[in-house]
Amino acid sequence: MFAIVETGGKQYKVKEQDVIKIEKLNASVGEEVTLDKVIALADVNNNIVFTHNAIVTASVLEQCRNDKIIVFKKKRRKNYRRKNGHRQYMTVLRVTKINNME
């Protein structure tokens, strides 16, 4: 059984006991989080069912930052160069339960 959930503007295909790295959520380590925007749900035979009232429960493993990306801007022959780095805040979740409320 798997579910497709949306959080942080991205979609993730998750099963129970999966570990996923998503955009930052305001939750502390060890706290239970519910992801209620479930787009699709699949049963044991991988038959996809589109449902509106399924809930995915996950626990927060860690709050961390992603790898650094470099943003480099340049205009040729004008001596214009800018270099910036960015590290996005991320939340690591372990999916504990996929619950269909039907």
From Swiss-Prot:
Gene Ontology MF term list: rRNA binding; structural constituent of ribosome
Keyword Ribosomal protein applies: yes
GO aspect biological process, one term: translation
Subunit (UniProt): Part of the 50S ribosomal subunit. Contacts protein L20.
Keyword list, A-Z: Ribonucleoprotein, Ribosomal protein, RNA-binding, rRNA-binding
NCBIfam families in the record: L21
Lineage: Bacteria, Pseudomonadati, Pseudomonadota, Alphaproteobacteria, Rickettsiales
Protein role: This protein binds to 23S rRNA in the presence of protein L20.
Gene (UniProt): rplU
Xref: HAMAP family: Ribosomal_bL21
Pfam families: Ribosomal_L21p
PROSITE patterns according to UniProt: RIBOSOMAL_L21
Glycosyltransferase keyword on record: no
Similarity comment: family membership: Belongs to the bacterial ribosomal protein bL21 family.
InterPro entries assigned: bL21-like, bL21-like_sf, Ribosomal_bL21, Ribosomal_bL21_CS
Name of the molecule in the record: Large ribosomal subunit protein bL21
GO cellular component, as recorded: cytoplasm; ribonucleoprotein complex; ribosome
